[in-house]
Amino acid sequence: KIISIDELHDKLEGMRDSDLILDVRTPEEFSSGHIQGARNEGHESVAGIADELKSYGTVYVHCKMGGRAKMASEALENSGLTNIVCVGNGGMERWGQMGWPTE
């Protein structure tokens, strides 16, 4: 499933504790500002944490614009995960343009 960053923003208030926002940008990009509560894991290494991600309700995978999120989401789905939602349209670039909060 693919959603936009706007849709993710709209879902934030109703997110469950079992849901995860997975930011697959570089650690440098992540430290310059990220969605509150997001976890960082580079898109190249997400398959290595697939087993750990099984315990989450829904994992929302995002990046700067959408490309790395799509690659990471495919890798996780290929690892057998069914709880992945790719935030493939917009990413942190749009998040910043909208002036939405970061930490």
Where are these regions (language model features)?
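Short, surface-exposed ligand- or partner-binding patches at beta-edge/loop junctions that are enriched
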Residues: V61-C63
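Rhodanese-like catalytic fold shared by cysteine-dependent sulfurtransferases
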Residues: K1-L20, P27-T58, G67-E103
